[in-house]
């Protein structure tokens, strides 16, 4: 297992050649590359230079073209649900509205799926209409007509300032607005069974392809 980090300079031909030299020096003639779009591009570049590479989709964003599932998505989703369940306990007892920012990097899968699973009152992504005034009105209806003691808003990252929205909720509704950015807690933890099974299936297929000297391919789940 080589491990990795972000390396923008890998786009450069000389850096790719250096990587190939390191691989050959260590007797490595095939790679299974796990990651997202950037990792795929790096794997393709190496395969075009003679290194057998098979790519496996690994990202919590679940936004890789050609596959319905990516390794890590289900675990991140579970982490979000677990966190929101705990927030709901305290929000109910203190009449609060939590504005929860989740990851996704412009993909709305984590926000949409977690909102459905958690039963959140409102979900905001770059594909939904974002109108603060409408959100305030919806929260007033939740409180005054449905007599809800709490509310949960799930928001995709890079959409809005969750702290600013929480402050406005405090000022204009009966709820005490609070914001929380779940951040990298979504990326960690023990993998859930869905991810373990998916990773095992994809790994088996990747190894089979490398044994057949196939290269420049990615594993997909349909």
Predicted feature locations:
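Short, ordered loop/turn segments at secondary-structure junctions
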Residues: 6-7, 36-38, 51, 56-63, ...
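Glycine-rich oxoanion-binding loops at beta->alpha junctions
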Residues: 1-33, 71-82
